[in-house]
Amino acid sequence: MSKIVLLPLDKRPCNYIYPQLLPTDGINLCFPPKNILGKKKIAGDFVKIKEWLLEETKDADFLVISLDTLLFGGIVPARINHLTLSEIEDRAKVVTLIKQQNPQIKIFANELIMRCPSYSLSDEEPDYFDLYGKEIFRYGQIVDMENQGMMTPELAEEFESLVKFIDRNDLKDYLDRRQINIAILLENLHLVANKIIDFFIIPQDDSNEFGFSSVDQKKVRDHINKYHIENNIIMYPGADEVGLTLIARAINQINNLKPKVLVCYSSSKGQFVVPSFEDRIIDETVKYQIYAIGGIRVDACAECDIILGINIGSQMLTKNDKRSDTVYGKNRNLLTFIDYLEYGKKLNKIVGIADVAYCNSADEELLILLRNQKMLYKIDAYAGWNTSSNTLGTTLSTLSCYNCTRDEKKKTEFLTYRYYEDYGYMDIVRDVINNEILTLEGSTRFFLGNNYDLILKKAYDLLEKHMKTHFLEIYDKVDTMKVSFPWNRTFEIMLDLTFKDK
């Protein structure tokens, strides 16, 4: 049995639980103990992570590793740490040690370009982002525009006002950290050139057309071109789905498969949409995602192994936008979309849906149509959570793994998790409890405080009731459900489902 060792980005469900739910029958997928991983702003234990990695990779065939976890202790600590470049370089040597003790192991790594969100909130950023996060983001945009020869007198004047507004020491702290993070990323590219890392994904978390992320992307591209390592390093929007993607790539290599993927959109204009928090049209990201799993895109249904259905309108809007009728009504045809996917199943194709019509939740209209057409469990994968790239990677990885393993039990269970979480919680329940939190003293949606148990019970009751009332086919597969808020906020929920024997 082939062994894949995973060091995830952190221990949130999307990084720690989702990989365990993949249809991976016949694969020994090895995870670190949760207690050595970080939690939000608390970094993971480097010493214990190093010990665990060196032990578990001795006899492993593949290592899927988040370098943000190894080097910084997790996705958020990478944005707030005060490690020196020398300290980080010492930690990076662990990757070479792993290859030295097991020269046959294939190492698939990922390392993020540090994000700079466009809003003022310190929930996952340095504390001073509460004061001027939006202004730091704008500062980065103007720096990028100047680098690209787009500076104007108006932008120069705005830049001067930003410099005066942002505390000098805080800005220096932020810029110094970005400089160190990109420096170590560029150094780690040499691990690819030196055959230590076999495949490297550089995801862009919350990217934008202009800004710090764009500046760092150019540095990475220049470095890749300089050392001629283009084939084994790719860079595209994403973050929390990348562990799934690299597991799928490993399983394809284990089975010597290169899955052929047909892409179908619910809107003819959908492929040209630039999703929220991303810097390019979705179809360009789809190409990278297919390449990342080790697949190839094809245009004919007859030759494909997998049909990736992408539910999207002619734009990506929020739920209550007044343009919804045009974007999701006139410019999209869900009936023919579902009809085509059903046709694919009749041809024995593996079929899944990446539900990216809205950011951060599922599309209820799609779920109702799938229910009415008896398609909820005819499809082989579904996701509709957080960003477009998160959803695309989750769906595609699940389809790819199922193509290799035909693990029916896990396939059904993962579908159920996604319907409960992406639709039931994120689309229905979360808004209700967020509105109720406004009436509770000492709680916000970013910190539940003393009302944690009260809010958790409310979430459980609402989720249980909604699925039982409106999606009985899904509800009937579940025996017990436990819920928790892993980061003490409402943005994500952790589900623990047990299933009825059928």
Regions found by a protein language model. Give the residues of each.
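An N-terminal assembly and electron-transfer interface module characteristic of large anaerobic redox
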Residues: M1-K502
